[in-house]
Amino acid sequence: MTPKKITGKILFFSDIDETLVNTDKSLSEENRAALEEFLARGNIFVISTGRALSGACNLLKRLGLYGKENLLVSSSNGAIVYDTYREKELLRRPVPRELMIEAFDLAREYPIFIQTYTDTSVVAEQDCESLQRYLALQQLPVEFCSNIRDAKIDPPPKLLCLDFFHPEKITQFRAFFQEKMRGRLDCFQSNPYLLEIVLPGVNKGTSLRFIAEQAGIPIDHTVSAGDAENDLSMILAAGIGCAMKNADDALKVKANYVTEHDNNHAGVAEILNRFCL
């Protein structure tokens, strides 16, 4: 049964890549118009992404969305919640330094490429072709260190393993990592080439519940939209969890609604118009 339109104040969580924006990272006029009308009615719109905060904010500035009232960013899969209008952090749940070091040791042992973050850049021990592709996509700078133990950085929001050329290696390392860490760190894939590593309990769903509670919005007045495995927690947490037409099949079977249009044809506007406007 298709959910009904919500009346009253609404919290909307949307993934960015392959959800809100087109594959070329542009924002359709249909999505822009629906999003602006949604905000004009006093609702809260959250960009919920695996991207690091600086990368997410850079994209929002390019799209002309940064700094709008009631537009928040939940970055690094929920590790940081940031108000772009007030330019203020509302939540930060970083990976402890000792666990970061242990994760780097495991990746080095395997071996697989791993990186972490400061508030403004990627931090890595070595260069590789996958890293350069990632930096170009995310438009982020990189800082290199000989060993992460010597890096003078704060506990990071997340770690990331990546391999754009051998995705099967990501899947294999995931099983190895989960066995070694035994619940001390969580990991999941945002796409076949990326393995996100965060503190247990950090995910898009817990971020949705946190913001809903802070804003005094009941869960049945929350909507989420996504396409990939790291979106599943917010699909399940929201009152109306929506999977894009282009989403993974595993996400579609768990969603309350699957869009008729994909991310390149204003699927988020479809959700906003059907349930929120």
Summary of predicted features, one role per range:
Residues M1-I16, A33-A40:
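Non-catalytic pre-domain segments flanking phosphatase-related domains
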Residues T2-L11, S28, E196-L277:
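Mg2+-dependent phosphoryl-transfer enzymes with acidic/Ser/Thr/Gly-rich catalytic loops
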Residues I16, G50-R51, G226-A228:
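Active-site metal-binding loops of divalent metal-dependent hydrolases
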Residues E69, N77, M181-G183, A237-A238, ...:
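Short, structured coil segments at secondary-structure junctions
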